[in-house]
């Protein structure tokens, strides 16, 4: 953002992003100030990615909005507002159904011998056991690293072990998140997963 030149003619900015909104007021205010420096308007709102998803999926309607991407999240929304949110808890404690959870379970299954694709997986990513452990425990953004294995999962979805991994992850998302909302409401999802 700092490298962008100022932009004229913009009357308002609505930004929806992960790590923004009411839950993260300091980060939201910092981003709002940075946006204000590039757009000649003070009509700038910074909100959560979940609120953006809810508004995109349901507008002024009512339903359950879900994000399945690097992480996962869900909410009950009505009239463009979030009424209830089951906390996602991040990739270590939650994020069921997310790319990070799928990647974590893939690596676990491969190295514990439950998924018979070890050599193909390591060759496809130019990795070894030590490198994976280093990237997960000693470098930032382990969630993104784990989520980067989602295309491998997609490419091998016909493998019974991979198919079961995916189904189990989505069942976990439903049982730990969707089950906390009224069952009669419709559910919509978006995201890279």
Residue ranges and their predicted role:
Residues 30-38, 60-64, 79-84:
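A glycine- and small-aliphatic-rich helix-loop capping segment at beta-alpha/alpha-beta transitions
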Residues 55, 66, 72-77:
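Short beta-strand scaffold segments in enzyme catalytic cores
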Residues 82-126:
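Glycine-rich phosphate-binding loop plus the immediately following alpha-helix
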Residues 22-30:
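Metal-dependent catalytic neighborhoods of phosphoester/phosphodiester hydrolases
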Residues 52:
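Metabolite-binding pocket within alpha/beta catalytic cores that recognizes anionic/polar moieties
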Residues 18-21, 70-73:
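Short glycine-rich anion-binding loops that position phosphate/pyrophosphate groups of nucleotides
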Residues 46-48:
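Short loop/edge segments at beta-strand edges and connector loops
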Residues 1-14, 37, 42, 57-64, ...:
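ATP-binding/phosphotransfer module of carbohydrate and carboxylate kinases, centering on a glycine-rich
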């Amino acid at each position: 953002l700092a490298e962008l030149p100022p932009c004229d003619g913009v009357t308002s900015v609505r930004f929806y992003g992960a790590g923004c909104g009411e839950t993260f007021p300091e980060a939201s205010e910092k981003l709002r100030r940075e946006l204000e420096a590039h757009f000649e308007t003070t009509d700038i709102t910074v909100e959560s990615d979940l609120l953006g998803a809810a508004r995109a999926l349901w507008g002024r309607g009512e339903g359950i909005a879900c994000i399945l991407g690097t992480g996962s999240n869900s909410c009950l929304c009505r009239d463009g507002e979030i009424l209830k949110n089951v906390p996602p808890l991040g990739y270590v404690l939650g994020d069921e159904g997310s790319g990070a959870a799928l990647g974590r379970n893939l690596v676990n299954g491969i190295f514990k011998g439950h998924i018979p694709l070890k050599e193909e997986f390591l060759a496809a990513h130019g990795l070894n056991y030590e490198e994976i452990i280093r990237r997960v425990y000693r470098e930032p953004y382990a969630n993104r690293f784990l989520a980067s294995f989602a295309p491998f999962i997609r490419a091998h979805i016909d493998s019974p072990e991979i198919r079961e991994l995916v189904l189990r992850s989505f069942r976990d998302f439903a049982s730990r998140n969707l089950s906390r909302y009224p069952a009669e409401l419709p559910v919509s999802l978006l995201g890279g997963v």
